[in-house]
Amino acid sequence: MKFFNYRDGKLSFQDSIAPNHGIGFGARHLDFHQNGNWIYIAVERQSEIHFLRIDEKAISKTIEQKASTLSQSIQPGVRQAVSAIHIHPSGDFVYVSNRAYSSGNYASGNTIPNGEDNIATFKIDKETGRVNLIQNIDTNGSLPRTFSIDPSGRLLIAANSEPASKKNELGQVVQLPVSLNLFKIGDDGKLEQSENLSFPGEDQLLFWAGFL
């Protein structure tokens, strides 16, 4: 992971972080806490959130906390990966999206075993910066590659990026189209399903989603 200084419209290299020489550290996305001292990293293939500290002088190369983003052990035939990570405008919560793939050679039309396509919600300790998993909620689709939180902190929208055939918790095969899933965000940071906007028959992918 590379860090750069930004000044007068120009970037200059500051530091590089590769815990354990980069082994087991597949950083995909990160977000800076509003206090400017904490960084939260989505570590893709490990399905983890990592927490480290930063100050005006240096970036800590010690990962202070590692926490799984999953609600259960990975199921047979499933490969899990995280994607986006965003901190709530209040600074009290951090959200990470989980994606489930087939662990074999997946081709369009094949059925993906039941896995976790969901948003993980973590509560941030205001004193220490450490996180605690408080919720995993399904996005009602497949491969939520990206999501956004509106500036008021009351809504979260997730983009289920690809159509898929997937087994549900009952073992039934269901067809999941490309879709946008809207959640309400409660005062406790937890998400509540609000609306799902699907695009059946679409062969395009939803890579990004945001609020205007």
Model-derived features: where do they sit?
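Short loop/turn segments immediately following beta-strands, especially the blade-tip
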Residues: 3-11, 52-62, 121-129, 182-192
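A detector of repeated loop/turn-to-beta-strand junctions in beta-rich toroidal repeat architectures
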Residues: 13, 46-48, 61, 114-118, ...
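A short beta-strand motif characteristic of beta-propeller blades
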Residues: 14-21, 65-75, 132-138, 194-198
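Beta-rich, blade/repeat-based domains predominating
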Residues: 21-38, 70-91, 100, 142-153, ...
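Short loop/turn segments immediately following the C-termini of beta-strands
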Residues: 44-45, 54, 90, 99-101, ...
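Short, conserved, GDST-rich strand-edge loop motifs in beta-rich repeat architectures
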Residues: 96-114, 159-175
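Blade-level signature of beta-propeller repeat domains, shared across WD40, Kelch, NHL, RCC1
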Residues: 162, 171-188, 192-212
